[in-house]
């Protein structure tokens, strides 16, 4: 005969049943809570976490906003630079959620090959032809931003330089049909910012839920509108060019709309998405270098003397070359100052992102499992054994390096080195660095010859830290006044 079950036993059994059913949910929730807390720590202190990790080991794990990664010391840069088992494209796609609708503009594949090939074979080779048009755009854009007032007045370099870079880049990327269109310029600037914001918003969600969440997050939905707006603005330009070239097959345009078509050679691609990807990859990083260099120069104790040296270099070089490519090569003090600013404040303390497509064994016998995401630390740029007095801004540092070396390219802004990873290393290094270097030098020529500049009263610029990223102080202010340039630019 069965004994009746007591109320206490029933409750205990029910509770046990509930626990069994809910335990996977509770485990998942507790796990995600732990991950969420780690992500919050990274967002606030990612910079310090990398430095702390390197003090303990040359290889360590780091929970980032977009999940776990392995960080390597700078000494590993050479051995992973071109390792075929480590994928750059897979890493980029993962970081930017390219598998999710709305982020598919960042999907790697044949279109990305077209983009990379265009930058290397067309943009870089056309820099000499682009210098004069870029200078013209700089004159047209700088004047309304900084004015012709001979009195000291305040400007915000963060917003004004960003707009100037967007204008110059668009002149080379999309031609004069859209490069002066305020809506297009605003779109190219805002698309980058909002893409990062949307990607970061998704990063806080569990990976499996992200495709669903992206359908409702306002920041993600905004990306669809950018793509549609860009499509609406570009379609008339593309159609007009098709009609013009149908009438005159020899008609050509010196910009990436034309160059993408030539490079593709029949391969499928979306010209609108390629333009957005190009803007995403170039405008903000180039502007950040210009802004940081100006802030560093103005903060230098010997700024007056340094400014005279820079101006003399620009004037003598311009009188010899005009707006021709050799001019840029002769601006050696400027080149050194730019590279020093990039050394002191890179855009991130880590770089060279990769995903292991198969297990990889490092030189110290560490095994990197398949599927692992890797980053390489940039901290060699602050190593006193490599750069004496590394925390001091020395605008002549790389000029001395060039003068002391038998290799003329040593220490140039665009040169690559495992001790200076701002542009990466190896075949996957930034292909647009030559164009970016030309842009920033053209802009600095105009600014230094046309304006007296100094930091606004009380302004002490300090880079903004966000995770492992470093951004030139967006709150910094300058005082500027128009001066008469010694040569007509």
UniProtKB/Swiss-Prot annotation:
Cofactor: heme
Membrane-spanning ranges: 10-30
Pathway: Secondary metabolite biosynthesis; terpenoid biosynthesis
Cell location: Membrane
PROSITE patterns with a match to the protein in the record: CYTOCHROME_P450
InterPro entries: Cyt_P450 (IPR001128), Cyt_P450_CS (IPR017972), Cyt_P450_E_grp-IV (IPR002403), Cyt_P450_sf (IPR036396)
Enzyme class, first EC level, given as a word: oxidoreductase
Annotated GO MF terms: heme binding; iron ion binding; monooxygenase activity; oxidoreductase activity, acting on paired donors, with incorporation or reduction of molecular oxygen
Keywords from the named record: Glycoprotein, Heme, Iron, Membrane, Metal-binding, Monooxygenase, Oxidoreductase, Transmembrane, Transmembrane helix
Free-text disruption phenotype from the record: Impairs the synthesis of terretonin but accumulates terrenoid.
Membrane disposition: Single-pass membrane protein
GO biological process: secondary metabolic process; terpenoid biosynthetic process
Binding site for heme: 430
GO cellular component: membrane
Main localisation: membrane
Residues glycosylated per entry: 364, 407
Role noted for this protein: Cytochrome P450 monooxygenase; part of the gene cluster that mediates the biosynthesis of terretonin, a fungal meroterpenoid that acts as a mycotoxin. The first step of the pathway is the synthesis of 3,5-dimethylorsellinic acid (DMOA) by the polyketide synthase trt4. DMOA is then prenylated into farnesyl-DMOA by the polyprenyl transferase trt2. Methylation by the methyltransferase trt5 then leads to farnesyl-DMOA methyl ester which is further subject to epoxidation by the FAD-dependent monooxygenase trt8 to yield epoxyfarnesyl-DMOA methyl ester.
Family per similarity comment: Belongs to the cytochrome P450 family.
Name of the featured protein: Cytochrome P450 monooxygenase trt6
């Amino acid at each position: 005969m069965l004994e009746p079950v007591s109320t206490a036993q029933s409750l205990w059994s029910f509770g046990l049943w509930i626990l069994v059913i809910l335990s996977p949910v509770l485990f998942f929730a507790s796990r995600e809570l732990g991950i969420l807390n780690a992500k919050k720590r990274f967002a606030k202190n990612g910079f310090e976490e990398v430095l702390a990790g390197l003090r303990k080991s040359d290889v360590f794990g780091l929970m980032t906003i977009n999940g776990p990664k392995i960080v390597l010391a700078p000494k590993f840069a050479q051995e992973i630079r071109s390792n075929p088992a480590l994928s750059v494209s897979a890493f980029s796609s993962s970081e930017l959620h390219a598998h999710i609708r709305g982020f598919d503009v960042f999907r790697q594949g044949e279109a990305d090959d077209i983009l990379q090939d265009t930058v290397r074979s067309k943009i870089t080779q056309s820099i000499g032809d682009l210098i004069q048009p870029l200078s013209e755009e700089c004159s047209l854009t700088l004047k309304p931003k900084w004015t012709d007032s001979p009195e000291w007045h305040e400007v915000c370099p963060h917003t004004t330089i960003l707009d100037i870079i967007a204008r110059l880049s668009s002149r080379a990327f999309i031609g004069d049909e859209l490069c002066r269109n305020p809506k297009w310029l605003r779109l190219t600037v805002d698309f980058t910012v909002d893409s990062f914001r949307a990607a970061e918003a998704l990063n806080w969600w569990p990976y499996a839920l992200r495709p669903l969440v992206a359908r409702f997050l306002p920041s993600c939905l905004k990306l669809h509108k950018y793509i549609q707006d860009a499509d609406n603005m570009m379609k008339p330009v593309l159609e007009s060019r098709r009609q013009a070239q149908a009438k005159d097959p020899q008609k050509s345009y010196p910009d990436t709309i034309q160059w993408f078509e030539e490079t593709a050679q029949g391969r499928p691609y979306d010209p609108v998405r390629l333009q957005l990807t190009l803007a995403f990859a170039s405008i903000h990083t180039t502007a950040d270098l210009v802004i940081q260099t100006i802030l560093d120069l103005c903060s230098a104790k010997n700024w007056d003397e340094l400014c005279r040296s820079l101006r003399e270099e620009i004037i003598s070089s311009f009188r010899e070359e005009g707006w021709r490519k050799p001019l840029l090569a002769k601006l050696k003090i400027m080149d050194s100052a730019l590279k020093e600013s990039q050394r002191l404040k890179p855009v991130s303390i880590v770089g060279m992102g990769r995903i292991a497509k198969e297990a990889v064994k490092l030189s110290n016998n560490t095994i990197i499992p398949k599927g692992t995401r890797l980053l390489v630390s940039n901290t060699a740029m602050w190593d006193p054994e490599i750069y004496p007095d590394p925390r001091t801004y020395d605008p002549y540092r790389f000029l001395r390096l060039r003068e002391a070396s038998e290799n003329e390219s040593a220490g140039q802004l665009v040169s690559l080195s495992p001790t200076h990873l701002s542009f990466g290393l190896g075949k996957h290094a930034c292909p647009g660095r030559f164009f970016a270097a030309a842009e920033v030098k053209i802009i600095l020529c105009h600014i230094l010859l046309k304006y007296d500049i100094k930091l606004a009263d009380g302004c002490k610029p300090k880079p903004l830290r966000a995770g492992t990223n470093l951004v030139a102080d967006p709150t910094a202010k300058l005082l500027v006044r128009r001066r008469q340039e010694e040569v007509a630019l």
